[in-house]
Amino acid sequence: MDNTQAIAPPSYSRRQLLNFLAGTTVAVTASAGAYAMGKFFVPPAEKGGAGGGIIAKDVLGNPIPASQILAEAPGTRALVAGLAGDPTYLIVKEDGSLDSIGIVDSCTHLGCTFPWNGNDQEFQCPCHGSRYHPDGSVARGPAPLPLKIVQVAVVDDQIFISPWTDLDPRTGEKPWWV
């Protein structure tokens, strides 16, 4: 005699089916919420030039046309939002064009922001007194390193800022921030 029974496929009760559907609904809703929160906290990719460059922006995040900066007097240092939103000085040269080197406004001593002093023709950090020459090299410490620089290019009245990849023109060596 054979005492084996055929195994019947499991049948879901109404309660199990409703629990499964409710759990699936909660999981889908939570996933959609997590995706939306992730998109909120991750900044959108910047669209810009080649080499990881971005368009220079004002404090409100609006692109700044090159003509606006170039309307300033020669020697002017205009502060814009550059790479990663870092404040960056753009320099109007004596011939009325924009310098291809921008200077990031972050002291190499402790990261303070600093103004350009037109009377003394140098950047002066108010936190601990570091001073920098117009090209961003250290004039007086305690800052140990020259200021970070970026590449600046003008294309169709748009200012593109991209990371500095060449040798530092002030030292002739590989930049310390690369």
Curated annotation (Swiss-Prot):
UniProt-listed SUPFAM superfamilies: ISP domain (SSF50022)
Positions of transmembrane segments: 17-36
Domain Rieske: 61-161
One of the GO BP terms on file: photosynthesis
Subunit structure: The 4 large subunits of the cytochrome b6-f complex are cytochrome b6, subunit IV (17 kDa polypeptide, PetD), cytochrome f and the Rieske protein, while the 4 small subunits are PetG, PetL, PetM and PetN. The complex functions as a dimer.
More details: The Rieske iron-sulfur protein is a high potential 2Fe-2S protein.
The protein's name: Cytochrome b6-f complex iron-sulfur subunit 1
